[in-house]
Amino acid sequence: IALGAAGGAASAAPSKGEAESLKSRAQGLVEAGYPAVLAAVTDSKGESAGVAVGKGNLETGQAPPMDGEVRIGSNTKTFVAVVVMQMVQEGKVGLDEPIETYLPGLIKGEGIDGSRITVRQLLQHTSGLPEYTDTTPGSGDIFQVKDHYIPPRDLLDTALGKPAQFEPGAQWKYTNTNYLVLGMLVERVSQRPVGEQIDERIVKKLGLSHTYFPAPGDRSIKGTHPQGYHLSAEGKLEDITEMDPVWGWAAGAMVSTPSELNTFFQAVFDGRLLTQSSIDEMKNGAVDASSYLGPGTVYGLGLIGRSLSCGGTSWGHGGTIHGYQTDNAVGPDGTAVTVAVTALPSAIADQNNLESSAKEKHQRNKDAVDATLCHK
């Protein structure tokens, strides 16, 4: 079991008790069936302690690397949301402007009209746009399609071939298509690739060296990393580390480490990336998200708010992509925690009782985040 400083000097670490508590919870997650757990807690001064337990490679039995790189799935959405909010600050984008203003003629279909969907509704998942990920690619055997390159425009066409889920603004429904469209908005406004905008506006600004948006066709994880695993059609955990994450694109393609995710989320709220009014805008007016994200959750503009067991609200996001799950948030006192596991809860769940078993497995990850932020 490795325990040490993540992304900082050995002496730079939150309280020993906090790190030990995170370590024991991480060990509990391995016992629950996750191949490996990589976690980091970062205090409000930016000092981190890391944990790495389990097996980073099931074939060799090798230990997972401390603060290794993992696919961060939907945490990508918060990076995209920050870029959009920066563009709002710069007067290049209007939150309550219709997406039609920026992507004329693109967003249309059955019950779908880009002139009636605002940028804010896309950020908040209240647009009513149909979902693309329920038909591509992981609805069948992911191992058959994991190396397929599907251009983002094709993913959008898949979504727009379906009817709208609801009238814009009428409901909330977590939908990856919203962030596909926001990625296209960023590219249209900047005339540059969305990954490059994230790199220039966020990654370089914060000095992150293990956080990146994969280049087209990039299937491997560049830096030191644990292997990610998924359940094969034969019911075995198989290595799925190498895959083309393009189908996640601006909704879920990025790679980072636990400590760098903590740094990013702290920077979202401490003024390094956004003005206070932008930060308030992202949190205020957050809508009830308990139908999908569980009791006590709300969704702002690219942010998930969660009621803590000790009172107050944590803000972060979290991400799911084949092989990796990350749960992360920043607490009211500025402490940040990320817990990354190297298989989805559904992959280690009881397959005969899949839904409730996967929910129970994932709840343990969320509980580890809550306990750390509550200094338990």
Question: What kind of feature is each model-predicted range?
Answer:
Residues 1-13:
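Secretory targeting and sorting signals
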Residues 33-35, 60-122, 166-175, 249, ...:
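Short active-site loop at a secondary-structure junction
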Residues 40-42, 98, 199:
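Outer-envelope exported proteins of Gram-negative bacteria
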